[in-house]
From Swiss-Prot:
Gene Ontology biological-process entries: actin cytoskeleton organization; adenylate cyclase-inhibiting G protein-coupled receptor signaling pathway; angiogenesis; blood vessel maturation; brain development; cardiac muscle tissue growth involved in heart morphogenesis; cell migration; cell population proliferation
Taxonomic lineage from the root: Eukaryota, Metazoa, Chordata, Craniata, Vertebrata
Entry GO CC: endosome; external side of plasma membrane; membrane raft; nucleoplasm; plasma membrane; presynapse
Binding site for sphing-4-enine 1-phosphate: R120, E121, F265, I266, A267, C268, W269
Phenotype when the gene is knocked out: Embryonic lethality, due to impaired vascular maturation and defects in heart development. Embryos appear normal up to 11.5 dpc, but after that they display massive hemorrhage. They have a normally arborized vascular network, but present excessive sprouting angiogenesis and severe aberrations in vessel size. Their aorta and other arteries are not properly enveloped by vascular smooth muscle cells, causing hemorrhage. Likewise, small blood vessels show a marked reduction in the number of vascular pericytes.
Protein's job: G-protein coupled receptor for the bioactive lysosphingolipid sphingosine 1-phosphate (S1P) that seems to be coupled to the G(i) subclass of heteromeric G proteins. Signaling leads to the activation of RAC1, SRC, PTK2/FAK1 and MAP kinases. Plays an important role in cell migration, probably via its role in the reorganization of the actin cytoskeleton and the formation of lamellipodia in response to stimuli that increase the activity of the sphingosine kinase SPHK1. Required for normal chemotaxis toward sphingosine 1-phosphate.
Ranges of Polar residues composition bias in the record: 371-382
Residues modified as Phosphoserine: S351, S353
Keyword flag Acetylation: yes
Positions of modified residues (N6-acetyllysine): K10
Species in which this protein is naturally found: Mus musculus
Modified residues (Phosphothreonine): T236
Annotated compartments: Cell membrane; Endosome; Membrane raft
Protein name in the entry: Sphingosine 1-phosphate receptor 1
Amino acid sequence: MVSTSIPEVKALRSSVSDYGNYDIIVRHYNYTGKLNIGAEKDHGIKLTSVVFILICCFIILENIFVLLTIWKTKKFHRPMYYFIGNLALSDLLAGVAYTANLLLSGATTYKLTPAQWFLREGSMFVALSASVFSLLAIAIERYITMLKMKLHNGSNSSRSFLLISACWVISLILGGLPIMGWNCISSLSSCSTVLPLYHKHYILFCTTVFTLLLLSIVILYCRIYSLVRTRSRRLTFRKNISKASRSSEKSLALLKTVIIVLSVFIACWAPLFILLLLDVGCKAKTCDILYKAEYFLVLAVLNSGTNPIIYTLTNKEMRRAFIRIVSCCKCPNGDSAGKFKRPIIPGMEFSRSKSDNSSHPQKDDGDNPETIMSSGNVNSSS
């Protein structure tokens, strides 16, 4: 019993000590052929890195304003907007993580311990994973809303927080797997070229997970569009011409929205997925395209910059609130603050009070789930 446990203890100590060994980074980068490429960066940050950092700064600023817009506007304190806020937070963190990644790259890489390297890369995985899982959570929430044809039920908030919590827990686990042991520190032949301390099986696993997420998002949005089309046909069958016409317009708007959402997501992420699959299949130093991974990664990060535009600024009410927040930041005076406290849309408070006192509040078009699904993805439910 003792004889079998001693080697295990030695192996554990060796594994733990490897996380603080600076030579491991050099050894793995040399094996994958990235050592000479990294040496070219000794003289400072490359121009492309500066451009990427500027893009990240824009992404960070953009998502900060989205969070401020949701926080400052009480009518956006609703379950659907919690998902938009969570998406903005994950996109903001993706911008921060990639900026830190760029600043700690190049010659600085060889000054990192494996543990620090895992934290540098793992933070990127966590932020980008949270962003993708947030997109899935938004699609799930919209699909459930369309099925129930209700926006205001008691379970919405708890379901929202449950989905948001699941996004972050799964993302943290996914990003933390390498530092917890799923790496190639003790197996050079299994190392990724793009990420030299990551095991190829882990890269394949992550690519598979993200591909399944993409397919799930595609299926959910197609189902949402199908539900809206079915409702439109029912109205036509009942010869309710005015409602059928409005529903058809919403269906068309929803179709455009779905195409934009899925096209942008695929355009940003598909190149990186393909690159990672090549990474799994190629032997070390055989695929030159793998040494250009930063261009594929920044494209995925760009998705964090397009999300606020697609999910926030295409909504008229959120766009007006967003512009008002930006205006307040540009002109921080008493008048601006006073203006912000007024209704975002003239007459909104008056019309809402009448609706609240009405015996049929559901007939307000703003409460129609179809409105939320069309016209810029998310419209106010009030």
